[in-house]
Amino acid sequence: ISPGMNMRFRALHDYTARLPLESATDEIMTLGNTTSTAVGQGVMQGIVNEIEGYIESFSKKNREISTIFTGGDAKHFVKRIKNAIFADCELVVCGLNRILDYNANKE
């Protein structure tokens, strides 16, 4: 279990004296050039590094690995993550809808 993106932004704001509350950005920068962009890029790149580290670790144990990235925040990371991934922000909703359709057709 790892803190999510919004929790990371909130923690930097809530537990420091003066860091602003930032949110996700799709702009890809190596380093921020202001406090706001540094907070944003720090959170975003930290998550990318964490995910890529997990993928690398699992890939060493299992040669064939498929990575599926879901959830509302997935859209912010698809272009940032270098490993081949499948991303669908609405995968859970689509799955639940298929279950609903399946159960409706059984009756």
State where each predicted segment sits.
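Adenine-nucleotide phosphate-binding core of ATP-dependent small-molecule kinases
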Residues: T25-S66, H76, A84-F86
